[in-house]
Amino acid sequence: MHRSKWVLLALSCLLVIIAGCGKANNANTSAANGNAATGGQTKELRDVKFVLDWSPNTNHTGLYVAQAKGFYEEEGLKLDILLPGSGGADAMVASGEVPFGISYQESVTQGRTQGVPLVSIAAVIQHNTSGFAAPVDRSIKAPKDFEGKTYGGWGSPVEEAVMKSIMDIDGGDVNKVKIINMGEADFFTAVKRDIDFAWIFYAWTGIEAELRGEPLDMLYVKDYSDKLDYYTPVISTNEKQIKDDPELIKAFLRATSKGYQYAIQHPEEAADILLNAVPDLDKDLVIASQKWLSPKYQDDAARWGEQKQSVWQNYSDWMYEKKLIEKPLDADAAFTNDFLPENK
């Protein structure tokens, strides 16, 4: 459920990949609009690829619901959901290898300031559900309590910058935290072996901890600064896709929005659909996670997927202040609500 450990490496490779590819797949730019069935005649469905950021989980449920319920077929589309390749989802989307994928505001921001043409077209979750988590026996109740503890991460400069930001607010010193790369170990293995806390999405790892009977102290980063209440994850496309085939994006988001709306209204049924599509997932975890996460997809937004300019501006300003990006972001170009369906 956490972001890829190779985000920075993938971003560094994107410009090379884009230069090599330079064009969208012909299948992504061919005309194939309209419903799957009209007037008794069946039209050929248009194949559309979507790449996940990680293994399937409840961040992705709306996609699987829309696929199972035929919402994509109603738009004349046949969705193929892919796992990311070695270069990562952002590279695949930015290069035009696939038209859509899961990304994060953080990586879209980093990418765009390096000339990578990613654009966020929908927020999967309206508010940041991530934060620093520790078993309760580590007595981490506030950011200052990170002092003297060991943090396990994936090696991104963003981690220490966020930690420093919230520790500064609480009067703590980030230099008193031991930071290590936890590698491929999962959270539960790592906290038993060599770390005290890590950055998690509560909807997955936090819910799993509840089911295991291993209570956590959870410090949500958004609770310490409005600038850290950013969109994670998002659905992204690339600038060429927007220019060449905006109607495909509209059709894709009409179906996807229906999938997430269904998951909001029917979390248990949506969980069953995800489990049917990915039977290797833990049933109890998926159901409990879906119940926790479904209300948070849209939350206080006017419609699912909607993004605010202020959220993009605030977070990119924070990244620039912390020297995580080399120049300010043109926030208006980094996202768009133009392709989301209007509320009915």
Which stretches of residues belong to each language-model region?
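Secondary-structure end/capping motifs
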Residues: D244-L324
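Short, hydrophobic secondary-structure boundary micro-motifs
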Residues: E75, S120, A271-I273, K327-L329
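Short, solvent-exposed loop/beta-turn-alpha elements that line the ligand-binding surface or hinge
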Residues: E74, K144, V221-L228, K296-Q309
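Short amphipathic alpha-helical segments at helix boundaries and their inter-helical linkers
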Residues: V98, I102-S103, P295-E306, P341-K344
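Short, glycine-/small- and polar/acidic-enriched structural segments
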Residues: T29-G183, F188, K192, D196-I200, ...
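Conserved C-terminal helix/tail region of periplasmic/extracytoplasmic solute-binding proteins
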Residues: W312-K344
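Short, low-complexity disordered leader/linker segments with a strong preference
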Residues: M1-R46, E342-K344
